[in-house]
Design a protein with these regions (language model features):
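Cross-family detector of peptidyl-prolyl cis-trans isomerase
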Residues: 1-121
């Protein structure tokens, strides 16, 4: 796995061949999220795949946790990336809704489905 200066770890498990996601783009993804403990994938807490509905957001716009804003940038459409997100780039000391405990490390598998560049519908 690659590690960024912020502490995010990522690995492209399936490189994409399409357009590259950049800050300011609107992106559509499928994802599954797990808690991670001691470097091991734990309990699944959310999955757009299970719901059958992709998730769309503005990349780099602060609409998602920082680990996603950083980790999805540079992906190419059709690609799948595993992100290991430290608490500081996730939900921090507050956790989230009783589902994600405080100071949790998160692991996501993210598949980039589409990119709409800023200024383009």
């Amino acid at each position: 796995m690659e590690r960024t200066v912020s502490g995010l770890q990522y690995e492209d498990t399936q490189p994409g061949q399409g357009e590259t996601a950049k800050a300011g783009d609107q992106v559509s993804v499928h994802y599954t999220g797990w808690l991670q403990q001691n470097g091991i994938r734990g309990a699944k807490f959310d999955s757009s795949k299970d719901r059958g509905t992709p998730f769309s957001f503005g990349l780099g716009a602060g609409q998602v946790i920082r680990g996603w804003d950083e980790g999805v940038q540079g992906m190419r459409v059709g690609g799948t990336r595993v992100l290991v997100i430290p608490a500081a780039l996730g939900y921090g000391a507050r956790g989230a809704g009783g589902v994600i405990p405080p100071n949790a490390t998160l692991q996501f598998e993210v598949e980039l489905l589409a990119v709409a560049a800023s200024g383009r519908p």
